[in-house]
């Protein structure tokens, strides 16, 4: 973001928007310290919430640009969520204004596996199981959240990376006074990451009068493909 702002001309206002207040404030502070000529502010916002979006007042006197970094919109597994976010962002823009965002367009299992099937992803999944044990309380003190091994699966039909845990032994847990069984060797889906083709993105954007004008593609060390898309409201 700093590099992008340094290459821009006549930028007067910058809003750091995030669902997490701490992240938004950190971004605002970085920009404020780096650029004396830019007025920066932090805003906590859920772009899928139409009511929250309606509170944003973009400049009527200047051209506006919305940049979405971090987690990519089109990786969400929920189609309704993607539509809500894209529609709400499109409604903020006037004709001729721009929206720039990143997209993970990888479609090779061979490249995706080493990028996603890591010790870090395994630890994240185990953290979810530790969180489950904590949420369930004292009645499940014997539940072992580490009795799982990681499994990677590429769902070609839905173009989704699925990270799962396979139970290494059977266990019983109690949820709302109901005994449930975790069965040995059964797979439990924990994390998903959707991959979307450029054509699918283009079709979805067109519903909200957003047109792709530039695509910048790159690859990581594993061969996974990423794209930065510049779109214009028409």
Label every model-predicted segment.
Residues 2-50:
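Class I SAM-dependent methyltransferase SAM/SAH-binding core
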Residues 17, 69, 100-103:
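Alpha/beta-hydrolase-fold catalytic nucleophile elbow
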Residues 50-61:
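Short amphipathic alpha-helix with an adjacent loop that forms part of the alpha/beta core around
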Residues 60-71:
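Short SAM/SAH-binding signature in class I
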Residues 74-88:
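A short, conserved alpha-helix within the catalytic core of class I
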Residues 91-108:
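Conserved beta-strand signature within the Rossmann-like core of class I S-adenosyl-L-methionine
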Residues 105, 112-211:
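Substrate-binding/catalytic lobe of Class I Rossmann-like enzymes that use SAM or dcSAM, i.e.
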Residues 222-234:
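Core SAM-dependent methyltransferase catalytic element
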């Amino acid at each position: 973001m700093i590099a992008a702002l340094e290459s821009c001309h006549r930028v007067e206002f910058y809003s750091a928007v995030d669902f997490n207040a701490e992240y938004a404030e950190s971004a605002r502070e970085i920009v404020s310290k780096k650029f004396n000529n830019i007025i920066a502010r932090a805003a906590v916002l859920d772009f899928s919430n139409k009511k929250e979006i309606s509170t944003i007042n973009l400049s009527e006197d200047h051209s506006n640009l919305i940049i979405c970094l971090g987690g990519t919109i089109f990786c969400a597994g929920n189609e309704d969520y993607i539509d809500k976010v894209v529609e709400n962002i499109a409604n903020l823009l006037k004709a001729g204004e721009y929206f720039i965002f990143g997209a993970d367009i990888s479609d090779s299992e061979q490249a995706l596996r080493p990028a996603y099937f890591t010790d870090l992803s395994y630890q994240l999944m185990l953290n979810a199981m530790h969180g489950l044990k904590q949420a369930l309380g004292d009645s499940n003190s014997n539940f072992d959240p580490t009795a799982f091994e990681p499994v990677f699966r590429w769902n070609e039909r839905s173009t989704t990376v699925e990270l799962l845990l396979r139970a290494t032994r059977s266990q019983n847990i109690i949820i709302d006074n109901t005994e449930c069984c975790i069965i040995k060797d059964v797979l439990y889906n924990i994390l998903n990451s959707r991959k979307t083709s450029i054509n699918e993105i283009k079709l979805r954007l067109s519903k909200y009068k957003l047109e792709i004008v530039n695509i910048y593609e790159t690859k990581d060390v594993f061969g996974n493909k990423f794209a930065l898309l510049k779109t214009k409201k028409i």
